[in-house]
A protein has these predicted regions:
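Hydrophobic secondary-structure segments that place a key small or acidic residue at a functional site
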Residues: 107-118, 127-219
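Hydrophobic, regular-secondary-structure patches
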Residues: 35-122, 139-142, 231, 259, ...
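Short helix-loop junctions at transmembrane helix boundaries
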Residues: 350-390, 400-413
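Mechanotransmission and gating elements of multispan inner-membrane complexes involved in transport
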Residues: 177-184, 188-287
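Juxtamembrane alpha-helical signal-transduction segment immediately C-terminal to a transmembrane helix
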Residues: 39, 43, 47, 282, ...
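Transmembrane alpha-helical interface segments in multi-pass membrane proteins
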Residues: 295-303, 310-312, 317-364, 386, ...
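N-terminal Sec/SRP start-transfer signal
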Residues: 1-34, 45, 267, 329, ...
Length: 419
């Protein structure tokens, strides 16, 4: 460390209170700037990694974003259902390689229940075309068996062999529960960092079975016992949506057009990638607003540092004069003020980074639980390094203003007593 840098460091230590406040101002600015950027990018990554390898999502006539949100992210509700015969027709279409039926509408203690079949565990992909795997047990086979997402099992303390009660609708209240039809947990999926972790999976037949006597949307009378229902043969009447994989992506647009003009019922077919792009387009204004607010906070922090340096410079006129009297040249005084600004900014950045990672470690499980966004404590990205470099350079530039004022002061200025 050079003599000027050592002197700058000792000068800041001598003015601890002011220096700490300035450092905290810069640190808060850095936390907000990088926090917004990290949440923005990782939210995108989390959404994009939720589903892969699916060529089309089919649901009742609806907008692209709405269909994507309720079928993949379990956000919102479907406008219409798909008739089971329509599902069978498209599942057996010559262009279709596989199809996954999805039936939504029930819940368990705040977690969505999804009816599906074996195709879901075989063909559903997330991330870089990763398949679902089990951390415990296996997929359901019996009527009243269920497979839990990792978050459901972890947060509610379930394990293979536990029994759960499903509630009708998304509000888990006493009068809406299927109390006499408990489901046995037979499998728990490995964590995926997607809405799969927050889902209770049952068979399509189970969805039909638990709604016997609930055809009007409410319990009309005594419901059959579980054993009586097991002896019946259930077939779905409707599903909420279906995920489709094609034999060749060349056929995507042709099949999409065929579904969108399907004469038997109003349906919509969307491509997940295009729907996600539309979703980001809708969110771009909010993203830009957040980044603008973060930028203004950084500017405010740097202006606070400028104010602190200018105020301290007025109080340090005698100190500067003594340095000049001891042989320091104007350029040395200039370098001293620049070094102080640089050190304040650098320490503020380091403090901000430490604070950011501490906050992320605390809020990570909370955001994962409530919003399904997986925040990672990863190393800084090149763009984040660039933002920090900008803050550091801006701090040095800010330091030029008091440094130039000190540079212009003569020896007699500091020795003159001002009243």
């Amino acid at each position: 460390m050079s003599a000027v840098a050592k002197l700058a460091w000792k000068s800041l230590i001598n003015r601890k209170a002011t220096a700490i406040l300035t450092i905290m101002t810069v640190a808060i600015s850095v936390i907000l700037l990088l926090g917004v950027e990290r949440i923005r990018t990782q939210a995108k990554d989390s959404f994009a990694n939720t589903i892969s390898g699916t060529d089309l999502i089919i649901g009742g006539r609806s907008g692209q974003v709405n269909l994507l949100l309720y079928s993949v992210f379990r956000i919102g509700n479907a406008t219409n259902n798909i008739d089971w015969k329509s599902y069978q027709e498209f599942a057996n279409h010559r262009a279709v390689d596989w199809a996954i039926p999805i039936s939504l509408g029930d819940s368990h203690k705040g977690f969505r229940v999804m009816g599906t079949n074996h195709s879901y565990f075989e063909h559903y992909k997330f991330g870089s075309k990763q398949s679902l795997t089990f951390s415990e047990g296996l997929e359901f086979n019996g009527l009243f068996e269920t497979v839990l997402g990792s978050d459901v099992a972890k947060q509610l303390g379930y394990h293979v062999g536990s029994e759960i009660i499903i509630a009708h609708g998304i509000s888990d209240v006493g009068f809406s529960r299927h109390d006499n039809l408990p489901f046995k947990v037979v499998g728990i999926l490995a964590p995926t960092g997607t809405p799969v972790d927050k889902t209770v999976h049952v068979s399509l037949e189970a969805i039909e079975a638990i709604h016997v006597g609930w055809e009007s949307g409410a319990r009309l009378g005594p419901t059959p016992k579980a054993q009586d229902l097991k002896n019946r043969d259930f077939q779905p009447k409707q599903i909420t949506a279906m995920l489709v994989g094609l034999k060749s992506r060349i056929q995507t647009f042709a099949l999409q057009r065929q579904i969108n003009t399907y004469p038997k019922e109003p349906l919509s077919a969307i491509m997940p990638g295009i729907a996600l792009h539309e979703l980001w387009g809708m969110m771009s204004v909010a993203e830009q607003a957040l980044m603008a607010v973060s930028g203004f906070v950084v500017i405010a922090g740097l202006l606070g540092m400028l104010s602190s340096l200018l105020t301290s410079l007025q109080e340090r006129r005698r100190e500067m004069a003594i340095l000049r009297a001891m042989g320091a040249r104007p350029r040395h005084v200039f370098s001293l003020l620049i070094s102080e600004a640089s050190l304040l900014t650098a320490v503020g950045i380091v403090t901000g980074l430490a604070g950011l990672y501490a906050i992320l470690a605390i809020v990570q499980p909370i955001i994962q639980q409530h919003y399904g966004i997986h925040l990672t404590l990863s190393l800084l990205s090149p763009y984040e390094w660039m933002l920090l470099g900008f803050v550091q350079c801006a701090g040095i530039v800010i330091g030029v203003i008091p440094a130039f004022r000190a540079y212009r002061q003569s020896l007699s200025d500091g020795m003159t007593i001002r009243i």
